A protein has these predicted regions:
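Conserved, mostly hydrophobic/aromatic
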Residues: 8, 46, 54, 87, ...
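Conserved anion-binding
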Residues: 10-11, 17-25, 100-186
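N-terminal beta-alpha supersecondary unit
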Residues: 14, 19-67
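Glycine-rich, proline-tolerant flexible connector loops at the mouths of alpha/beta enzymes
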Residues: 51-72, 111-117, 181-190
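Conserved beta-strand positions in the central sheet of alpha/beta enzyme cores
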Residues: 55-56, 108-109, 137-139, 180, ...
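Charged helix-capping and loop-helix junction motifs
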Residues: 67-74, 120-125, 161-166, 191-199, ...
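Catalytic cores of alpha/beta
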Residues: 73-106, 196-234, 250-252
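C-terminal helical cap(s) of enzyme catalytic domains, especially alpha/beta-barrels
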Residues: 119-130, 221-256
């Protein structure tokens, strides 16, 4: 299990938000933490700690008046740590190369691939061809409904018809290098991980899988290690001391 850091950017600022609270209308979100530091500061911190494979997420839609400020922050972070960070948020074949050339190791994609509630295999091929399989991470962010974990899109606001299963991951795995999975219902709440989801993800062995959502303590990290059979990497946001939480960054920085 490795620690994968994050830089979440909303309205041009590095923030930690409650995952299910994003609303495109008015660019609103329930905030846990708003940093006085810029995205490049965190990129430099992760670089110095030798942490690779973290992700930068743009939390504004392309139609937002704040999108350009958010994108500018993201590009600064990539420039500070070339090859060390992945990027997601509004990625499509038309802009994937721009982010890779700016220093991203991988691009993260959800909404472009899961169109109108189902997988667009055509779009998946397009983004794989544009970015290259070795630079593509599929973000299977999901929310629980009727006992299943459904993939959600559009900044986690829209449910798709696609359920996270091993079979689905095996099919999608031929197109990508890694998976990132946000457990959106617990994201930003730091009240514990989605154990059932972690147990499912821990059965998948073909590609690296990073779990994000709900980690509030070192006990939660250990629970995730147990549930995921040690196979899952972990992203911690709101619970980290660098984002106003109590888990020391230095402790997790040893997990690499």
């Amino acid at each position: 299990m490795k620690f994968r850091p994050c830089i979440d950017i909303h309205n041009g600022k590095v923030k930690q938000i409650v995952g299910g609270s994003l609303k495109d209308q008015g660019d609103q979100a329930a905030e846990n933490f708003v940093s006085e530091q810029d995205a490049a500061f965190y990129a430099e911190l992760y670089k110095k700690a030798g942490l690779k494979g973290g992700h930068v997420i743009l939390l504004n839609g392309k139609d937002s008046p704040n999108y350009e400020a958010t994108k500018a922050q993201a590009l600064q972070a990539l420039g500070k740590y070339p090859g060390g960070l992945q990027i997601g948020g509004g990625i499509c074949p038309e802009n994937a190369a721009e982010y890779l050339e700016a220093g991203a190791s991988h691009v993260l994609v959800t909404s472009y691939v899961f169109k109108n509630g189902v997988i667009s295999w055509e779009n998946l091929e397009k983004i794989r061809n544009a970015a290259g399989k070795e630079h593509l991470v599929l973000d299977l962010s999901c929310r629980k409904k009727d006992g299943n974990y459904y993939i959600v899109t559009d900044r986690w606001q829209k449910f798709t018809e696609e359920i996270v299963t091993l079979e689905l991951m095996e099919k999608l795995g031929s197109y990508c290098d890694e998976f990132l999975v946000h457990a959106v219902d617990v994201e930003g709440k730091a009240h514990g991980v989605e154990t059932e989801l972690a147990e499912l993800l821990g059965q998948y062995t073909a590609h690296p899988v990073t779990y994000a959502g709900g980690v509030g303590s070192m006990a939660d990290i250990e629970e995730l290690r147990r549930a995921g059979q040690g196979r899952l990497d972990v992203t911690v946001g709101s619970a980290l001391d660098i984002f106003g939480g109590s888990i020391p960054f230095e402790v997790l920085a040893e997990m690499k």
